[in-house]
Regions:
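C-terminal accessory region of radical SAM enzymes
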Residues: 284-311, 337-386
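Local cysteine-cluster metal-coordination motifs and their immediate loop/turn environment
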Residues: 94-104, 334, 372-391
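Short, small/polar residue-rich loop motifs at catalytic or cofactor-binding pockets
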Residues: 13, 317-321
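N-terminal [4Fe-4S]-dependent radical SAM core
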Residues: 3-28, 49-88, 441
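Hydrophobic "anchor" residues
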Residues: 26, 331-332
């Protein structure tokens, strides 16, 4: 037996939090009375008793024969080549707002009937494949709701029906500014089984209306009311309420904004703070954490902070083999965080609903794991970071980025992440009234 390379021990008040990056298991022990014993068990695993059994079960101690890097590589390949197919579709690149930080160019025009037919043929092809058991369609843009009736509704309805016919699980979701989500459209969203939304606000009402307006017409109240309507009329909906922030926005009274959402729907809303990318060089972790805590204390769904994750073996959904991002003109991309210039094109959709991929790009993407480089393989954070996404690593290799390591730009350090993960696990166990191990205290 040997100690895992991915054990972390973080002092917290009068205790030490013990965390393993591969298993995601976390517990705490008394700093004064128990930690030295636990550490000795882990560092020199001799004999068999209840303590060593617990540590082995939770991967703090592993078999001599276990290669943790191979375990991570194997699970990375499994997650990238799994049996779900994810389509991200842009009905348009038009938008009813003009946010100053948006990286997209508002090209006029919507998806044509011809391209819609190609997409329906693609969906037929995907759902008839024996190895595909789930289809996920994410609507993106531009503002996708500009062409809800013309594009989103008919394609989603088609996909829902053909998935039911072929016994394929179907999910659809949308990233939207939320302004056009009328009561009538919410009813139509129920019909196509859309239950997940990402909707953005920019700080408080005053700041938001300066950034997000329709030719000067304020949008804040309309968006908040639409979010409340979605939670009211679509049972079990899940909303990611993205708050784009700068240091100035973090200092606002975010609680006043969040209090606009009734208590009974807050469990369906996860508040996700994301820094405006033009201010990525700035830092204010203290205010960021204060606001994350505030959202949690107000009853919103739990959210982890930082760029780290548990049991996620690839960085981005776009790194998966069964993924395609289809623009309104039928051209195919991978990354949803870049523009739609020729440089980022990865293929094109044929009349028969087949994606003609750029084979060179696919070979580069899938020949090995993105973290299969010296820096990542030697890093203790690998299981909870899983390296760069393909696009960031490509930009770095082509000299268009100075770094590919997320840790170098992470506003929340790893110790803080682990402490907060531990506290989140405790809170969830209490809310579910699970039997809580004394080790969580």
């Amino acid at each position: 037996m040997k100690s895992s390379k991915y054990n972390f021990f973080i002092p917290y008040k009068d205790r030490v939090i013990c965390f393993n990056g591969i298993s995601g298991k976390v517990f705490s022990v008394s700093k004064e009375h128990e930690f030295d014993d636990i550490k000795q068990y882990i560092e020199t695993p001799i004999g068999k008793n209840n303590v060593t059994d617990f540590l082995v079960q939770n991967k703090f101690i592993i078999e001599d024969s276990m290669d943790e890097l191979e375990f991570l590589k194997t699970n990375n390949r499994r997650s990238i080549f799994d049996n779900s197919y994810h389509l991200v579709i842009n009905p348009t690149l038009e938008c009813n707002f003009k946010c100053w930080y948006c990286y997209e160019k508002a090209v006029v025009g919507r998806m044509s009937d011809r391209t819609m037919k190609k997409i329906k043929n693609l969906i037929k092809n995907i759902t008839s494949e024996e190895n595909i058991d789930e289809l996920i369609i994410s609507w993106f843009g531009g503002e996708p709701m500009l062409y809800f009736c013309q594009v989103i509704y008919p394609i989603s309805l088609f996909a829902r029906n053909i998935c039911e016919k072929n016994n394929v699980k179907f999910e659809t979701n949308m990233t939207t500014n939320g302004f056009l989500l009328s009561r009538e459209r919410i009813q139509m969203l129920r019909e196509i089984k859309m239950m997940r939304f990402q909707i953005t606000i920019d700080g408080n009402k005053k700041t938001h209306n300066k950034v997000r307006n329709q030719n000067g017409k304020p949008s804040f109240d309309e968006i908040v009311n639409n979010i409340i309507s979605i939670c009211t009329y679509i049972p079990n909906t899940h909303i990611t309420l993205r708050i784009n922030y700068t240091n100035e926005i973090l200092k606002q009274d975010i609680g006043e904004t969040l209090s606009l959402f009734p208590k009974q729907i807050r469990k369906n809303i996860r508040v996700d703070f994301q820094r405006v990318w033009q201010t990525e060089g700035e830092r204010n972790a203290v205010e960021l954490l204060r606001n994350i805590d505030l959202a949690s204390d107000m009853g919103f769904a739990p959210a982890l902070c930082g760029e780290y994750s548990i049991h996620k073996y690839h960085r981005c959904y776009a790194d998966r083999f069964n993924f395609a991002h289809i623009n309104f003109d039928g051209k195919v991309y991978r990354c949803t965080a870049r523009d739609y210039s020729q440089r980022y094109e990865c293929g094109e959709l044929s009349e028969a609903g087949e994606i003609i991929w750029n084979t060179k790009i696919n070979e580069l993407m899938f020949s090995k794991s993105n973290f299969d480089n010296e820096k990542c393989l030697s890093c203790k954070l690998l299981p909870i970071c899983v390296g760069p996404c393909y696009q960031n690593y490509r930009d770095y290799k082509e000299g268009k980025s100075s770094a590919f390591c997320f840790e170098e730009n992470n506003e929340i350090d790893v110790n803080t992440f682990i402490v907060r993960y531990y506290l989140t696990v405790k809170k969830i166990c209490r809310e579910r009234q699970d039997a809580i191990s004394p080790l969580l205290y």
